[in-house]
Amino acid sequence: MSIPRLPHQWHHLDRRTTLAQQGCALHRYLRDCVLPFSPHYRALFRERGLTAGDFHSVADLKKLPFTRKEDLLPTPENPRRTLDFALAPDAALLARRPSVMLRALLRGRARVRDELEREWRPVFMTSTTGRSTEPVPFLYTRHDIGNLGLGAGRIVEIGGVRPDERMVNLFPFAPHLAFWYMYYAGLDRNVFALATGGGKVMGTEGNIRAILKLQPQILVAMPTFLYHVLQLAAEQKLRFEGLRILVLGGEKVPPGIRGKLAALCEQLGSPGVRIMATYGFTEAKLAWTECPVAPGETPPGYHLYPDQGIVEIIDPETGEPVPDGQGGEIVWTPLDQRGTVVLRYRTGDRSEHGVTWEPCPCCGRRMPRLVGKISRVSDVRSLRFQKVKGTIVDFNELERALDDLPGIGAWQIELRKAHDDPLDLDEINLHVAPAGDVPQDALEATLRETLHARFEIRPNRILFHSPADLRALQKVGVALKEQKVVDRRPEASSGPAGGGESLPPPRESRP
């Protein structure tokens, strides 16, 4: 049963009306889609003594236990565990539903059979990147692909992209959400869009040629890869005139990288570009976007789509929902998905200021927004630089600090063990490609002062590279995602670490 949606009024409803409609949609979704056809949640609800009748409001979600990524991973006892989260409809049960019988009478059995196939049969898949665990596949039906286009098209709408404008999608071609989301964004809003497949498909030079030939107004990419594309084009003294909006995703987008990208665009002949950061994750089959803002302006937060799902913010320690405007962990529940479905999914991502329902200061839309920085819990690591104690390093903030420092074009953090001994102390090497006219000695001093003052880190080595060598180190155009943080520490059971890049000798500075 398809849940009624509000594609035209989705951004004009007040908080009370939106929450009431979400509560009704949640009840119907559980009753008609999830509990009849999800092996995992049918068993979970039975075990907890719950039914769809226990859920009539967003607040009722507290009755439902969280789903975590670990719940989706295969086990020796259940190697196909992920499929327990995929909706597997019973054809006989569907055929007996009064709504289906009525549709068959009005439209004919063959047409309704085709409609049910399109709604329920998986035909597409994306997967998690496998950064922290093995990749987890998420199945889509044609119904889900329609929702994918609906959500992606809202990025085009919020960005104010006109039908006569052109987009170039530089996201890497892979079964990952970012590439396909922006692929369907152009289709949904009938906007011309070229998907290059990123650096691994066409190479950095190939992407530059595509931009030169198409002369787009909108570029869509990961920030690090886009920086390298623009920086190389600037080295070659090319012109990318007419760029208006940069849509960024897949990585953090701190103020420093916004400013560097805008400065490169101006150098290439496109002053005044505005930037839209997006936030999404595979498990949501969805991504949200900011309004376009100029570098230096405070981003207004990510516009959520309340007709497609519920975003809760919880205290990560207690699991309790927090008030609006308070930070916490992001939890996701869909309202209209088929294929793979997860309820109350704990993302491990923390929103600095949680959800606000105040009208957006940029566009005036009244739907909820995620406000402030978003950080991944898994990016907080314990490192042992001394014999006596460890140091907790928040790599979320460390990456932002490096991106925000003037004089740095690109960088890579390399984690190693002293003497390649897995039982020895941790070491940090910082690889840097300078930008601008900051003297190397001054840049080194600034880096050491900043890292020690803010993070209690003293890099073992700071190594300076040319932009081309740093591109090779980050595997630009080789890896699906540029490598900004590389952990080469050997496991205690393994031999010495390897895998370093063969580069021209860098200009090295030691503490």
Where are the language model's segments positioned?
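Generic structural signal for residues in well-ordered beta-strands
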Residues: 193, 275, 311, 411-413, ...
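Nucleotide 5′-phosphate-binding alpha/beta core
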Residues: 1-127, 133-150, 158, 426-431, ...
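AMP-binding/adenylate-forming catalytic core of the ANL superfamily
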Residues: 219, 331-455, 460, 480
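Conserved AMP-binding/adenylate-forming
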Residues: 253-359
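Detector for glycine-centered tight turns/loop "hinges" at secondary-structure junctions
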Residues: 133, 237, 318-319, 480
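Active-site phosphate/ATP/adenylate-binding loop shared across adenylate-forming ligases
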Residues: 3-11, 68-276, 284, 288-294, ...
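Conserved beta-strand termini and adjacent loop/short-helix elements that scaffold enzyme active sites
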Residues: 196, 278, 314, 416, ...
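Short hydrophobic segments within beta-strands
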Residues: 170, 248-249, 431-433, 483
